[in-house]
Amino acid sequence: MSTPLTRKVNADDHVAGPSDAPVTLVEYGDFECEFCGRAFPIVQSVRKSLGARIRFVYRHFPLREAHPHAEHAAEASEAAADLGGNDGFWAMHNQLFNNQDALEDDDLLRYVAEIGLDARAVDEALASGTFAPRVRADFRSGVRSGVNGTPTFFVNEERYDGSWMNEREFTRAILDAAESGARRPPVGTDVVPRSAPEPRPDA
């Protein structure tokens, strides 16, 4: 049986789409994950095609051992949310996935400036680990929900283990899964190592 989403979507989440949408798609992702990068334009297109029928939620699941820049990228997106609200988060989210090959701290600060936010404030937040607890909370909620790789998707609080690589199939599967709970073998994820640590503790 598929593991359900243990932490319900709430006011702390980053949400795009209407609250009364019939389908809620939750992604546990990693900004440095190759597969998440491949999924990004597909998810964007699915959201566009489904319009008001879908609500999209992004949660952090940085695989620190495999992706050394992922944690700071996640923290930078949280800092952007703190400065610019929901719009700030999604603008940074898009910048990070559009520039996966350049995620050093200097790059992160440049993206912050490009979306019109205070890069100095984000630099200070990264140095102090201000938003590390927020990222860690997402990570832990993913572990409790059976997440062991990225990207991992949940459709209406049930894990979706089908293929997301084909946009048409993914769109159809999201709607089918919402109605019938149909499942397929998992395809295309970066897997968390057995001994992978959680994101770093507070500084």
Set out the residue ranges of the language-model regions.
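Structural alpha/beta surface segment adjacent to cysteine/selenocysteine redox centers
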Residues: 26, 31-113, 184-200
